[in-house]
């Protein structure tokens, strides 16, 4: 098996280095990751400046672009040979609920899906036990049936920040919800000009049983299938009925 590994924290991040080391025990691994932290880049692509992949001494690649750039460029540009799976992570911090909208970690996996490959995104609910998350991924990959690694979807994994032996197991979950966050931090820079920082994420609003928030909070690894189709199917019929009523009067 040949695995392409990327992330949004940058090639230097501890999470991706631990993940690549562990994955190399079960597969051939190619790392192509951003040259700096690109957290919350979502699925943005760089269209207004050239991308420059740099081949590092250890064989990895870093790119002056987003997570989606890295996967797109690797698979369509400079990598030769077949890739069987895309794995993105290990993110420093969870990607649950509404986090998935902004996440560059998920975006790298979704780009692999868009290019026809099965893909996994993995995040740690903290910054300590990266080895735990890496072991979880290596444990799951051989066990996931081929049909579960559907190129039309990705698997989103969130791991409690615990020693591996303290994990309670795995739970398949739906996404929860966070409360709306409107915090912006206003400061002055050294030139006395006003600057702003986007504030931290809000607390979970829906962390009921069955959600990813609930699973991780209670010591379980959450596993959530994610699709790129954003159609609100439950609203199609009512919207169609409204349209017919409004325009057939």
Curated annotation (Swiss-Prot):
Subcellular location(s) of the protein: Cytoplasm
Q: Where is the signal peptide?
A: none
Binding positions for a divalent metal cation? Answer: 8-9, 39, 91
> Does the record bear Amino-acid biosynthesis in its keywords?
no
Query: What is the UniProt remark on how the cofactor binds and its stoichiometry?
Result: Binds 1 divalent metal cation per subunit.
Q: What are the protein's GO molecular function terms?
A: 3'-nucleotidase activity; 5'-nucleotidase activity; exopolyphosphatase activity; metal ion binding; nucleotide binding
Q: Which reaction does it catalyse?
A: a ribonucleoside 5'-phosphate + H2O = a ribonucleoside + phosphate
Give the required cofactors. Answer: a divalent metal cation
The protein's UniProt keywords, in alphabetical order, are: Cytoplasm, Hydrolase, Metal-binding, Nucleotide-binding
Q: Which Gene3D superfamilies match?
A: Survival protein SurE-like phosphatase/nucleotidase
Q: What is its main location?
A: cytoplasm
Instruction: State the EC number(s).
Output: 3.1.3.5
Where are its TM segments located?
none
Q: Name one GO cellular component term.
A: cytoplasm
One Pfam family for this entry, by name?
Answer: SurE
As for family, the record states: Belongs to the SurE nucleotidase family.
Reported function: Nucleotidase that shows phosphatase activity on nucleoside 5'-monophosphates.
Q: Which PANTHER family match?
A: 5'-NUCLEOTIDASE SURE, 5'_3'-NUCLEOTIDASE SURE
Recorded protein name is 5'-nucleotidase SurE
Which organism does this record belong to? Answer: Haemophilus influenzae (strain PittGG)
């Amino acid at each position: 098996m040949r695995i392409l590994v990327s992330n949004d924290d940058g090639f230097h991040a501890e999470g991706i280095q631990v993940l690549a080391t562990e994955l190399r025990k079960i597969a051939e691994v190619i790392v192509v990751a951003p040259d700096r932290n690109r957290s919350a880049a979502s699925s943005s692509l760089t269209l207004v400046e050239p991308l420059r992949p740099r081949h590092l001494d250890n064989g990895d690649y870093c790119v002056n672009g987003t997570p989606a750039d890295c996967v797109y460029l690797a698979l369509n540009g400079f990598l030769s040979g077949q890739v069987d799976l895309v794995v993105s992570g290990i993110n420093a911090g969870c990607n649950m609920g509404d986090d998935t909208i902004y996440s560059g970690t998920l975006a790298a996996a979704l780009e692999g899906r868009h290019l026809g490959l099965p893909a996994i995104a993995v995040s740690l609910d903290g910054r300590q036990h990266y080895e735990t998350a890496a072991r979880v991924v290596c444990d799951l990959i051989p066990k996931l049936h081929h049909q579960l690694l559907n190129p039309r979807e990705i698997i989103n994994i969130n791991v409690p920040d615990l020693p591996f032996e303290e994990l309670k197991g795995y739970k398949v979950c739906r996404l929860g919800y966070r409360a709306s966050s409107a915090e912006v931090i206003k400061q002055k820079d050294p030139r006395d000009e006003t600057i702003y920082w986007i504030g931290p994420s809000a607390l979970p609003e829906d962390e009921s049983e069955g959600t990813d928030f609930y699973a991780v909070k209670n010591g379980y690894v959450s596993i959530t299938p994610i699709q790129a189709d954003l159609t609100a199917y439950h609203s199609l019929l009512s919207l169609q009925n409204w349209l017919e009523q409004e325009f057939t009067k």
